Each structure stands twice: as C-alpha cells, then as structure tokens.
Amino acid sequence: MKRIYLLLSLLTGCLYMQAAIYNVRDFGAKADGKAIDSPAINRAIEAAAQEGGGTVYLPAGEYACYSIRLKSNIHLYLEQGARIIAAFPEKDKGYDMAEPNEHNKYQ
C-alpha cells in the first residue's frame, strides 16, 4: 500500500513539474517577416522565466528580430518552417550594445 501511495505521489508531482509552453503568437508575434517580433519573443521568454522556465514555441513563419534575451531554464522550439531573421536597425531602434568581455569586445 505504501508503494502505491508513493508511486501515485511521484506521478502527480511529475505532472505538475512539466514546464509550460509559451506560444509567441499569444504574446503578439506576427511572423510575417516585416513586423519586429523580438518584443513578443522577449515577453514570452520573460513570462516563462517568471514561472521558473518553460518552452518558448515559435510556429512556422518568419520572425524579424533585434536582440533576443534568453534566460535560464528557457528552451526555444522552432517549428519546421520557422525562421528568425535579423531585422535592419532603424535610427532609434535596433540591437543591444555588446557587453564588456575580458577576452574581446564582442559578446
């Protein structure tokens, strides 16, 4: 009886430990290759990070992006046909500056 109770407890715990999936379209990504999707992707990453981790899911499409800021325990899953493309920087928008590094000036 104790073994059955232990087994049920472990199975229940495993179900609750499954990481959530965060679809970037739910956070505003357009995936049309024109709209800048990095803010939506970063919002999905932030939401997953606040819950302790998870999978950020990118359905098929073209995601024009500036900097994407990954965090611990976050997995990016690109569906077949999904591409992240570099967006052309604008005058007042664009990529994060390179962070200082003791080995060279690039990240």
What does each model-identified segment do?
Residues M1-Y22:
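Bacterial Sec-dependent N-terminal signal peptides
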